[in-house]
Curated annotation (Swiss-Prot):
This is Large ribosomal subunit protein bL35. SUPFAM superfamilies: L35p-like. One of its GO terms (biological process) is translation. The gene is rpmI. Keywords: Ribonucleoprotein, Ribosomal protein. GO terms for molecular function: structural constituent of ribosome.
Length: 65
């Protein structure tokens, strides 16, 4: 039986936590930042967790995580 390939793009975007969840970076913080408030940018800079509904897809992309 061959090894299952890891989706490399997903491996760079998600990190598994000790409790079994996945951390992810929030979007909308790369460009066009002048119109966004400081508060909005500050809240976007923190890591977020992958939703439970999407966790199945992430696990399929990262078989050895």
């Amino acid at each position: 039986m061959p090894k299952i390939k890891t989706v490399r793009g997903a491996a760079k975007r998600f990190k598994k936590t000790a409790s079994g969840g996945f951390k992810r970076k929030q979007s909308h913080l790369r460009h066009i930042l002048t119109k966004k408030t400081t508060k909005r940018k500050r809240h976007l800079c923190h890591k977020s967790m992958v939703a439970k509904a999407d966790q199945v897809l992430v696990v399929a992309c990262l078989p050895y995580a």
